[in-house]
């Protein structure tokens, strides 16, 4: 259930447990939104506002060290599969920040939508890294995030360099 997933996220003792619980909560919330709607289109889509509310609640339950800001939300209809992939990618990026930049003093997530696009930006002020230094056999950054999003038409970018923190950008445009 949604409440059980959120409680599990709040009480988890490791980053992996928090990530799994937060993902579960987001999926449960978006499914609930989808099932509750009587609009046939909503069975395959979720509003950007519902997605942002779900993400914000799950992130805030998961960590008090992450600021979440929503900018000018326009209620855009987003394919359900795209919304879930963006939510999972957001949690993976936050998990990477928590695990690999534990000394970061700032983590921010900005959620924005326009008439035809949706954007999620995750920024930390950790030590940063070079993408080329991530071993090719690591699935997290390259496969789990970039490949999955790209197959759904979501652009994914990571800007980072040593001493500069990391900025993840996930952007989807409506056809």
Report the location of each language-model feature.
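DHp/HisKA dimerization-phosphotransfer hairpin of two-component histidine kinases
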Residues: 1-69
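Conserved short strand/loop->alpha-helix "switch" segment adjacent to the catalytic nucleotide/phosphoryl-transfer site
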Residues: 65-90
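Conserved phosphate/oxyanion-binding catalytic-loop motifs
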Residues: 93
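A short, flexible helix-to-loop-to-beta junction within the catalytic ATP-binding CA
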Residues: 98-105
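A conserved short beta-strand within the histidine kinase catalytic ATPase domain
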Residues: 105-112
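Glycine-rich nucleotide-binding loop
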Residues: 117, 128, 161-169
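Acidic ATP/Mg2+-coordinating residue in the GHKL
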Residues: 124
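ATP phosphate-binding glycine-rich loop and adjacent ATP-lid/helix-beta elements
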Residues: 133-162
